[in-house]
Each structure stands twice: as structure tokens, then as C-alpha cells.
From Swiss-Prot:
Region Disordered, annotated ranges: 235-291
Biological classification of the source: Eukaryota, Fungi, Dikarya, Ascomycota, Saccharomycotina
Residue ranges the record marks as coiled coil: none
UniProt GO cellular component terms: cytoplasm; nucleus; ribonucleoprotein complex
Protein name (Swiss-Prot/TrEMBL): Regulator of rDNA transcription protein 5
Role this protein plays: May be involved in the modulation of rDNA transcription.
This protein's encoding gene: RRT5
Keywords on record: RNA-binding, Transcription, Transcription regulation
Amino acid sequence: MTEQVNSDTTSDTTTTITTVYISNLPFTASERDLHAFLNNYGASSVLIPTQTVRRFSKRHNSNPRKPLGIAFAQFANNTLALKAIQDLNGTVFQNQKLFLKLHVPYEADSTPDTDVKKPKEKNKVKKTPETAADTVYCHDLPDDITDSEIRELFQLYSPQEIWIYRSKVYRRKCIPFAPHQITAALVTLQSETPIGDICDSVAKTATLRGKSIIVKPAYVSKIQEIKQLVKDNLTNARDPPPAALAEPAPAPAPAPVEPAEQVQEGQDNAETNDVPPPPASSSDRPTVAAA
């Protein structure tokens, strides 16, 4: 059923087409020459598309417009266009065979709505981290800040626990600058006042060493991170890693072993405490007569 509808649509379209597409046109042919060639078939206008080709040499740039070897001829009605195609298709024009057909304009197929992909949402809603209801975050504190100074700052809200720590911060994300350390603190309060009102009140009225401070509700994830770091530090301090085993001392070198005869002679001398007799002289030796 669909193919039949498409064929009917195509046939209806071709009956209304009055433009003829001509290919294999000689590059030397002009629009005037082609119009004279089609004049007997009622061609109202002729168009030969060209392209502009520019070169570095001035000698070759005298005529930068180059024809594409095709043409479009407009006729008064579809009947004249079909007549021209029937009679002139395959005929020779300026030593080249021409090919003619109806020019059917290109139409893109319509895409069903089901296949259209939805555009991605550019402005996605960022997920806000969860904040604690009883803990505030103090930012950019002096490096030598003490626990007592922070307690005095939040004395109206009964501070319970205070964690002072240092962290690295990057000022700009697009430029790879080296990070700098800041001193911050997490303060757990015991008050019925909403945590947002406490932050606004302290940030507007309180000062620390003559400078205003930044106070915000603390993120739950940051509180858990700091508590885990404190727990790990306490565990490492309580159970230090075992020291490296000392290398065993080298064994003493064995005493030199004397020959058995020297040992026996030494033992005999030690027992008698006598000096060994001197070796016999040549006069004491027996004389051997010559044969």
C-alpha cells in the first residue's frame, strides 16, 4: 500500500516538472549556444552552472569561472519538456553526446517523531549536598586559631565539639595554579535557633581578631570525612607500626687453629716448665767416613 502511494506521488510530481537536466555538456558550450539548440522545443531559459577556480598565476586567472559540464533548461510546460527529452536524448552537440532527463528536486525524507532524539538538558539541576542541622562551617580562619577563640565566638549557641583542620583549595579551576592551604573549623552547636539564622547572625555581627568570618551550614559529607580522619590519626597514635627488626650482630671470627705438633709441644712445656733443648750442633753429629 505504501509503495503504491509513493509511486502515485512520484507520477504526480513528474507531470508538473518543466525543468530538464542536461549532462555531458561540452565545457566550451555557452548558454547562448545551448538555448539556440533547444529553441525549436520552446526552451524559455538555460542555465549552465560554473565554479570559480583561482590560481596563483595571473596567466591562468584570466577566466576563473569553469563550467561543470551540466545544464538546466526551463520549458513552458511538462509536455514540451518531455518532447525535448524524447527527441534530443543521445544527440550530438558540439561533438559530444547529450543526456537529458527531467530534473526532480531533492526532498529530504520526513523523520518520524518517535525517532527524534530529545535534546539534552543544558541547564541540569545540580544536586545540593545535604547539610547538618547542628553544625556550622567556619572558613578562612587564622592559622594559629585556638579552640577557646571559637568557643567564645559561638558562646550564645552552646558549642559542643570543635574540629580545626587545614585543607587545600584551588582559587581557579580553569588555570592550574598551585593550591593554597586554609584553616577551617567545624563547630557543633546545641541551640534551638535554626542553623541558617545562626550563620547569618554570626557572619554579620561577630568578628575574629578584627576581621569578619565566613560561616555556613556544614555538609554532612565533610563532617564524616573529618571524623574519619581524626579516628585514623588516633588509631595510628595508639598502635604505631612495628619498628624494623635489627640486623643480627656478626658472629666472632674463629681463633686460628695451630698444628697438632705445636699444640702437643706447648702442652709438654706447660707441664714441665722447662725450656726446650737447643738443636744439636755440628760437632755433636757423628762423622761419616768417606768410602
